């Protein structure tokens, strides 16, 4: 069974698998500054909410490692924190990881060397926990996958979107590993083709039977192939269960509802943001118009044509059958049950 990591820490540098070039090329980048990490997040060298959070934590480590006792420690760390927070606005794991790091450095009274050591340990803890959490999510979610299941999936939620194993694709991977004889239909996921480029690459590496489809084929596929369930990830889950995920998830959820296909959101509890009341309160990133006007290096639309290119949409809670987390599966009513999930921690 193949395995791969999108992120690896090597003491004084962060090594990232550059996802912009998959599946054509497998390239790794070595990042040595917080500015490089912020740029990698913004340019989607690294992507996926959990992976972004881990990368940001290591960005803070790279910042503190460059500081000397003559530097204004808090000022420099705050600048790095602000830079990373501005890199991508929607994925709450980014802010969650930076908040964990900030609890340590804000008001720290020890030596600079101690702070360097403690921040590095916190980042490696966040990395390690991500893998452990993903494997527990997979074990919790696999009970929803029947033998011989046909599953539809949007975007990429596997090892490339996390440190390792994955969230929604982690459930799929575990179902395959225990012999459930599944078949996965992968939305190509325009405009950046994370389904066709990344999820299909992961499925090929893992030997999981799969078929790539265009995003607009989901309804036909559900009807023709009798899809059993839809599994998607999340970049932010509001307190009422509304879920921001890759653009096209909302469409998939509507089609799934019409065809009576249960749609489950798969995410760690760090993606649940109880401070955000509802989907309308989630900031939605908009990306370059050229992502729509071009495919690769080829222009496919007039340069003068206006473009609306949100990176995410919000799926209303009423279209979601359940939310699979490391602490269990949360069912409606989400506002009440998500709160209970944290109260029981």
From Swiss-Prot:
<feature type="binding site">
    <location>
        <position position="88"/>
    </location>
    <ligand>
        <name>substrate</name>
    </ligand>
</feature>
<comment type="similarity">
    <text>Belongs to the eIF-2B alpha/beta/delta subunits family. MtnA subfamily.</text>
</comment>
<feature type="binding site">
    <location>
        <begin position="47"/>
        <end position="49"/>
    </location>
    <ligand>
        <name>substrate</name>
    </ligand>
</feature>
<keyword id="KW-0028">Amino-acid biosynthesis</keyword>
<comment type="function">
    <text>Catalyzes the interconversion of methylthioribose-1-phosphate (MTR-1-P) into methylthioribulose-1-phosphate (MTRu-1-P).</text>
</comment>
<feature type="binding site">
    <location>
        <begin position="245"/>
        <end position="246"/>
    </location>
    <ligand>
        <name>substrate</name>
    </ligand>
</feature>
<comment type="pathway">
    <text>Amino-acid biosynthesis; L-methionine biosynthesis via salvage pathway; L-methionine from S-methyl-5-thio-alpha-D-ribose 1-phosphate: step 1/6.</text>
</comment>
<dbReference type="InterPro" id="IPR005251">
    <property type="entry name" value="IF-M1Pi"/>
</dbReference>
<dbReference type="InterPro" id="IPR027363">
    <property type="entry name" value="M1Pi_N"/>
</dbReference>
<keyword id="KW-0486">Methionine biosynthesis</keyword>
<dbReference type="InterPro" id="IPR011559">
    <property type="entry name" value="Initiation_fac_2B_a/b/d"/>
</dbReference>
<dbReference type="InterPro" id="IPR037171">
    <property type="entry name" value="NagB/RpiA_transferase-like"/>
</dbReference>
<feature type="site" description="Transition state stabilizer">
    <location>
        <position position="155"/>
    </location>
</feature>
<dbReference type="GO" id="GO:0046523">
    <property type="term" value="F:S-methyl-5-thioribose-1-phosphate isomerase activity"/>
</dbReference>
<feature type="binding site">
    <location>
        <position position="194"/>
    </location>
    <ligand>
        <name>substrate</name>
    </ligand>
</feature>
<dbReference type="InterPro" id="IPR000649">
    <property type="entry name" value="IF-2B-related"/>
</dbReference>
<feature type="active site" description="Proton donor">
    <location>
        <position position="235"/>
    </location>
</feature>
<dbReference type="InterPro" id="IPR042529">
    <property type="entry name" value="IF_2B-like_C"/>
</dbReference>
<dbReference type="Pfam" id="PF01008">
    <property type="entry name" value="IF-2B"/>
</dbReference>
<keyword id="KW-0413">Isomerase</keyword>
<protein>
    <recommendedName>
        <fullName>Methylthioribose-1-phosphate isomerase 2</fullName>
        <ecNumber>5.3.1.23</ecNumber>
    </recommendedName>
</protein>
<dbReference type="GO" id="GO:0019509">
    <property type="term" value="P:L-methionine salvage from methylthioadenosine"/>
</dbReference>
């Amino acid at each position: 069974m193949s395995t791969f990591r999108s992120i690896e820490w090597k003491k004084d540098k962060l090594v990232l698998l550059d996802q912009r070039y998959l599946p054509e090329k497998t390239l790794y980048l070595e990042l040595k500054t917080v500015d490089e990490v912020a740029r990698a997040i913004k340019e989607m060298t690294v992507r996926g909410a959990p992976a972004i959070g881990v990368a940001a934590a290591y960005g803070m480590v790279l910042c503190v490692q460059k500081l000397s006792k003559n530097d204004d420690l808090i000022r420099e760390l705050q600048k790095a924190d602000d830079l990373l927070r501005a890199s991508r606005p929607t994925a709450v794991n980014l802010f969650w990881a930076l908040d964990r790091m900030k609890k340590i450095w804000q008001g720290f009274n020890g030596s600079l060397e101690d702070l360097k050591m403690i921040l590095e340990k916190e980042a490696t803890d966040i990395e390690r926990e991500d893998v452990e959490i993903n494997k527990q999510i997979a074990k919790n979610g696999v009970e929803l996958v029947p033998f011989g299941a046909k599953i539809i999936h949007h975007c990429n939620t596997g090892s490339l979107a996390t440190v390792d194993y994955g969230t929604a694709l982690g459930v799929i991977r575990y179902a395959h590993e225990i012999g459930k004889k599944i078949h996965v239909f992968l939305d190509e996921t325009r405009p950046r083709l994370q389904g066709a480029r990344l999820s299909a690459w992961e499925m090929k590496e893992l030997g999981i039977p799969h078929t790539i489809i265009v995003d607009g084929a989901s309804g036909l596929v559900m009807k023709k192939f009798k899809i059993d369930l839809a599994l998607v990830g999340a970049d932010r889950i509001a307190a009422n269960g509304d879920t921001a995920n890759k653009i096209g998830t909302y469409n998939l959820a509507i089609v799934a509802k019409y065809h009576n296909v249960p749609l489950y959101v798969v995410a760690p509890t760090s993606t649940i943001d109880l401070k955000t009341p509802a989907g309308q309160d989630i900031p939605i990133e908009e990306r370059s118009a050229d992502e729509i006007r071009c495919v690769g290096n080829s222009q496919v639309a007039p340069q003068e044509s206006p473009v609306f290119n949100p990176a995410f949409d919000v799926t209303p809670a009423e279209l979601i059958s359940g939310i699979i987390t490391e602490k269990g599966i949360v069912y409606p009513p989400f506002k009440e049950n998500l709160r209970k999930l944290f109260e029981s921690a």
